[in-house]
Amino acid sequence: MAEAAETQVKTAAAKSKDPGGAVWGTGRRKSSVARVRVLKGKGNITVNRRPYGDYFPILQDRAKVEETLVLLGARETVDVHVNVAGGGSTGQAGAIAMGLARAMRKYDATHEEKLRTSGLLTRDSRMKERKKYGRRGARRGFQFSKR
């Protein structure tokens, strides 16, 4: 029974790889969407055809991008290519982190438990609240003067 489950996991992983041996994952955060491609390599990470260190000058965003690879110990064994659009740098970093986690789950199905317990496969559903009429922003009212 365990052998059947193991072969099923292997065939599912084999089906999800493209002809070049790469796997894809899509991540979203706020208004950002990231398409992440993971393949065997030396640890290079490119975001929109630029090194991720140049693309994300803020260390917090770089750490968010690397978080999945560091957790799985795959920082030096895979290359990551990302196309990301929309939103700001923090939203894009979050979208990349989710897309990378989904791609790594396809790359090796044994990683799923670790990714799920660390919360990397959970979509952060928080979105910007819309501005309401009769107010200055989503919640803040206009300045009030008694006299």
List the predicted regions and their residue ranges.
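Structured, basic alpha/beta domains of bacterial-type, RNA-associated proteins
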Residues: 2-4, 10-28, 34-85, 90-147
